[in-house]
Amino acid sequence: MKEFTDLDLYYMNSGEHTTLYEKMGAHMVKERNKILGTHFRVYAPNAREVFVIGDFNAWQRSHQMQWEIDGVFQLYVEGLKSLENYKYLIITHDGREIYKADPYAFFSQVRPETASTTYNSRYKFKDQAWMNERVEYDFKEQPVSIYELHLGSWKQKFVNRNEGGAPMEAFNSYKDITPLLIEHLKENNYTHVELLPITEHPLDASWGYQVTGYYSPTSRFGKPDELKYLVDQLHQAGIGVILD
């Protein structure tokens, strides 16, 4: 795992660190594509102690993080792989216990649960042709038509709570939406789609602006690699993607 340096600390404190997610949060440690464990790092400058707790240790204080540099704590957990639920247990100097989801988590539990989830992305994009064309695209001279949508309410489907029960709303997954969205956009000659917030948020009824995880695509529609599939397929269809 990459070391957290004085330079990282300087740019983090000044608000200028543009790749902080590469060093903070939970990262798989691999050797020849085999996951050996997970490295955790979190910034908790006012903590006395910090623990990583989760399903893997029965949510107990068996994995204490080490102070690394000026309020940054880190820990490597051997053998911990993808899709493990976890939180940080922060002990304050006056003895209070505070349970926190990871602000740099790449995946989260489905609401109403609130834990973060380790995640190993394996997706390989195949949109290089579109990416190359984007460099040459002149927005001042070529048409731009943007379709804005909220994934949670677009093309809603309904399922029964139980046999003979009243129908209830259900979400399409990222993969379910992909062919439907591409067809709609192409039929109506849109060049781009703008997705209302798809980062993790607590309320199904909201548009997603109450963000609880800026690096975590909401799990109500599926896994992060399934979102990557959606973006990849849109690009391959010649459609740009804007994230609100």
Please place each PLM-identified region on the residue numbering.
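Residues that line or immediately flank small-molecule/substrate-binding pockets and catalytic motifs
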Residues: 54, 153, 197
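Short proline/glycine-enriched turn/loop motifs at strand-loop junctions of beta-rich domains
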Residues: 43-50, 57-59, 81
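Aromatic-lined carbohydrate-binding/catalytic grooves of carbohydrate-active enzymes
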Residues: 156-172, 183-228
